[in-house]
A protein has these predicted regions:
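Cytochrome P450
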Residues: 1-424
């Protein structure tokens, strides 16, 4: 049961909030920032009960890793902090059909993870991404053309931020334009399952809605894959269904799971980074002016700073495979830890004045694309390119554009903006 802002307990100490309570994630951002600052100041990571979900068994609880150093070490040691035992994208252990369907490689360890990543990674190398540069550039131009035609006051998220990654991912896979809206709607359901706008008011049917959205996306790519097997083109689906690396290729189930991962991760996270980017520029006119003074020269630093503060994915979960001491804390075999990237990207031990948006910042690295190691975001190069091009086009043609009244996604997993009015 949700509570009103007036009923929420003020955050004075680490005992005043619960990361497993969905209402914590609906608090204002400054309260969330203060809460994680308190957690980073504790002698050892805080331990929490697990969220209660009807379709998952009750769990033993988890440690919240909120310091940059802890998240880097856990990410670099997948043999100790594994992803495949119950899944990485949810804190409770998920049924196998969920981890296979909605996480694909994210919810796997080696050797399965290495095999799948080896097959699909060829499409996401810097060399391959360079082949899409002209498409990204042209799409951004058309999006700003449409924005100017619609005029001030439209929804920046749906009219700008969501359009670019959706088009690029669908084009890469060979999904026809008539299905863009279908893909967009289903990905919203998968990542916004608890948000009332996407049907989340009926908690009892969340699992059914998630599975149905996954089944529909899976069927879309299975039909396309079957056609591309007989009639291959230059798109990514053709490459995946016909890929043969050391005698291996994707199974039909693996193709479906990877597609779901791609459209969800590739669309939702990049669109939220772009949305937060405009909000940050609106709140920090000095940084807008600085970026405008050298749009191309300041773009790399600005994009990294946007991703750091946006932190589109709040967390991933790991399970400890053997007793292990990390930075003074002993973790026992079978215990769960949750890697809060959002918190690590605001760690005072790494980032000077961490809440400040500073496009010249040099400290890091941030973990907005996940921590270092085998699960680092496969599409990071593409995401950086999309964010760079979108803001280059906006700053050149609509330099005074602002984002106001953002509506946040009701989610503990995704740090998302659903809607935001743009004014220019």
């Amino acid at each position: 049961m949700s509570v009103t802002p007036a009923e929420r307990r003020p955050i004075v100490s680490a005992d005043d909030f619960d990361l497993s309570d969905y209402d914590f994630w609906a608090r204002p951002m400054h309260e969330r920032e203060h809460a994680f600052q308190l957690l980073r100041g504790l002698e050892r990571p805080a331990f929490y009960r697990e969220p209660e979900i009807d379709f998952a068994p009750p769990g033993p609880g988890y440690y919240a890793l909120v310091r940059h150093a802890d998240i880097l070490e856990a990410s670099r040691n997948p043999e100790v902090f594994c992803s495949g035992d119950g899944g990485a994208t949810n804190i409770p252990d998920m049924p196998p059909e969920f981890t296979e369907y909605f996480g694909s490689m994210i919810n796997m360890d080696d050797p399965r993870h290495a095999r799948l990543r080896r097959i699909v990674s060829r499409a996401f190398t810097p060399k391959m991404i360079k082949q899409f540069e002209a498409d990204v550039d042209a799409a951004a131009v058309r999006i700003v053309d449409d924005l100017l035609a619609k005029g001030s006051g439209c929804d920046f998220v749906t009219e700008v931020a969501a359009k670019l990654p959706l088009k690029i991912i669908c084009d890469m896979m060979g999904i026809p334009e008539k299905d863009y809206g279908f893909v967009f709607d289903r990905s919203n359901v998968i990542l916004g399952g608890f948000d009332p706008e996407y049907g989340g008011s009926d908690v009892s049917s969340i699992a059914e809605r998630l599975l149905m959205a996954g089944l529909e996306l899976n069927q879309l790519v299975q039909d396309l894959g079957a056609h591309r097997t007989e009639h291959p083109t230059s798109d990514l689906t053709s490459s995946l269904v016909n890929a043969n690396i050391d005698g291996e290729r994707l199974t039909a189930q693996e193709l479906g799971s990877f597609f779901i991962l791609l459209v969800v991760a590739g669309n939702e996270t990049t669109r939220n980074a772009i949305s937060y980017g405009l909000r940050l520029l609106t709140q920090n006119p000095d940084q807008r002016a600085l970026w405008l003074s050298d749009i191309d020269g300041h773009a790399p630093g600005a994009v990294e700073e946007i991703v750091r503060l946006a932190s589109p994915v709040n967390y991933m979960r790991r399970k400890v495979t053997r007793d292990h001491e990390m930075n003074g804390t002993l973790y026992r075999k079978g215990e769960k830890v949750v890697l809060y990237y959002w918190a690590a990207n605001r760690d005072e031990a790494v980032f000077t004045d961490p809440l400040r948006f500073d496009i010249l910042r040099t400290e890091g690295p941030h973990v907005g694309f996940g921590g270092p190691g085998p699960h680092f975001c496969l599409g990071a190069h593409l995401a950086r390119r999309e964010i760079t091009v979108m803001f280059r086009e906006l700053l050149r043609r609509v330099p005074g554009i602002e984002g106001h009244r953002p509506e946040r996604l009701y989610s503990s997993f995704i740090n998302g903006i659903k809607h935001m009015e743009c004014v220019f």
